[in-house]
Design a protein with these regions (language model features):
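Intrinsically disordered, low-complexity acidic/polar segments
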Residues: 18-20, 50, 62, 98
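Short, surface-exposed ligand-recognition loops at beta-strand->loop->(often short) alpha-helix junctions
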Residues: 10-22
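An amphipathic, aromatic/His-enriched active-site/gating alpha helix that lines ligand/cofactor pockets
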Residues: 27-38, 56-90
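Glycine-rich beta-strand-turn "strand-cap" elements at beta-sheet edges
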Residues: 1-5, 38-49, 75-101
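Alpha-helical structural elements of signaling/regulatory helical domains
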Residues: 16-17, 34, 45
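Short, well-ordered beta-strand segments in beta-rich or mixed alpha/beta enzyme
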Residues: 5-11, 40-67
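Non-catalytic surface loops within mature trypsin-like serine protease
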Residues: 13-15, 59, 93-96
C-alpha cells in the first residue's frame, strides 16, 4: 500500500498542556486504522508548545471517512480545550520518502 493522500497539522498547546496534547495524539484511533499508513507526531525544536502531525493515508476518501466518524470527532473534542491560537491544516499529495518509527 502507498500513501496517496497526506495531511499536515500544526497546533499550539495552551502553556503547560503540550505533553497532554501529544499523549492524546499518540493514542489517536487513526494509528491502528488500516488506511492510515503514516502518523507522525513531533514537537517544534524552537517552541515546545507547538506540535506537528503528519499523516499519510491510502486515499483522501479514507481520510475524510475516518475523520467524519465518531472516534475522530471525539478525539477532536478532547484536543480543542488544550489548544490556543489558530491551528493550520493542510492536505498534501505524497510524492515519496521514507518513514521508520
Amino acid at each position: 500500500m502507498t500513501a496517496q493522500h497526506g495531511f499536515q497539522a500544526t497546533m499550539t498547546a495552551q502553556p503547560g498542556k503540550a505533553d497532554e496534547l501529544i499523549k492524546l495524539l499518540l493514542d489517536a484511533p487513526s494509528l491502528p486504522h488500516d488506511d492510515c499508513l503514516v502518523f507522525l507526531v513531533s514537537r517544534s525544536a524552537s517552541n515546545p508548545d507547538v506540535v506537528h502531525v503528519i499523516e499519510g493515508w491510502t486515499s483522501a476518501e479514507a481520510h475524510s471517512a475516518f475523520f467524519g466518524g465518531e472516534q475522530a470527532q471525539a478525539l477532536v473534542a478532547k484536543l480543542q480545550p488544550l489548544l490556543t491560537g489558530e491551528s493550520t491544516y493542510t492536505d498534501a499529495v505524497p510524492v515519496g520518502g521514507k518513514a521508520t518509527l
